[in-house]
Amino acid sequence: PEVLPAWMDADDVAYYADEFDRAGFRGGLNWYRCLRLNSELLAPWRGAVIRQPSMFIAGERDGVLRFPASASQIDRFSTTLPGLRGCHILEGAGHWIQRERAAQVNELLLGFLRGL
C-alpha cells in the first residue's frame, strides 16, 4: 500500500517480504487447505462447553466477525463459555488487534490474568 497503517512500518513490510520470498506462502496457505480436515478432526468436540476462565477480544472491523457463524457463536458464549470473563470488540480495529491496539489488548490481558 502507498500508506502503511500506524501499526506497521517499512521494516515490518521488508521483514514479511523477505520471509515470504525465502519460504513462500505455502505455510500460511496450509491453514486454508486444511479447513475441511480440521472440521472433521474437531467434530467430536463440536458443542463442547469450555469451563476454564476465558476472554474474547476482536476488532469490530475484523472480517471474521462477518462470517455467518460468528454472530451466533458470540450470542451463545453464555452457554458455551460459562467462565467467560469478558467479551471485548475493539472499535475501529481489524484482524490484527495485537498489533493495531497493542496497549489496549495488553491491558485487557493483564486485567484478565490479575483476576484469575
What residue spans do the PLM features occupy?
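Conserved loop-alpha-helix segment in the C-terminal half of the alpha/beta-hydrolase fold
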Residues: 48, 55-93
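Alpha/beta-hydrolase
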Residues: 1-68
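Alpha-helical elements of Rossmann-like donor-binding domains used by nucleotide-donor carbohydrate transfer enzymes
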Residues: 15, 27-34, 72, 76, ...
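Short alpha-helical interface elements
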Residues: 40-45, 56-57, 79-81, 106-115
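Catalytic active-site module of serine/aspartate enzymes centered on a nucleophile-bearing elbow/loop
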Residues: 82-116
